[in-house]
Amino acid sequence: MTQLRFVKTPEQLIEAAENNLEFFDANMQAIKAWYKTEPGLIEQLIPAPLEPHADPMVRIVISRVFVDLNGGMDFGAATFGVNCMYKGKEGIYEITMPMETEGVVVGGRETYGEPKKIADVTASKDGDDCVATVTRHGITY
């Protein structure tokens, strides 16, 4: 039987946050966008036992992150995911997680199986204007 890995109860998350050095202070500036996609598309992307959501949506978050760890790290990060259902609960299945630094990629990919890839990630704000991009293998999106 197929089971999702890394599913945790709210109590397990609270305990991990209180007792794990992995949880540290971070600041982030991000642009988040949701958009509707074609019915039938998400079914082609998500693995069983996940099921498509009745209202198929794509979520994109592109950000600049500062982590206050070992003198501080500043890097670009993005996530591209689709909404879905698991046993009647809503969630997001991450398709890819472009990140700027190898250390950030390896930590999440090797520890948690996250779909992280190295890419150039920019996010900036000037007054009311925001611009964010991800570039991987010369392709900007």
Predicted regions and their residues:
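Hydrophobic, proline/glycine-rich low-complexity stretches
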Residues: 1-67
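Context-gated lysine
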Residues: 8, 32, 36, 87-89, ...
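Solvent-exposed loop and beta-edge segments used for protein-protein assembly and interaction
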Residues: 25-27, 54, 72-76, 87-89, ...
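Hydrophobic residues positioned within well-ordered beta-strands of beta-sheet architectures
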Residues: 31-33, 80, 132
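Structured loops at beta-to-helix junctions and adjacent beta-edge loops in soluble globular domains
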Residues: 34-36, 63, 83-85, 98, ...
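Short, surface-exposed linear patches
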Residues: 53-58, 81-84, 103-106, 117-119
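Hydrophobic/aromatic-rich structural module bridging two neighboring secondary-structure elements via a short loop
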Residues: 66-110
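Internal, well-folded beta-alpha domain core
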Residues: 91-141
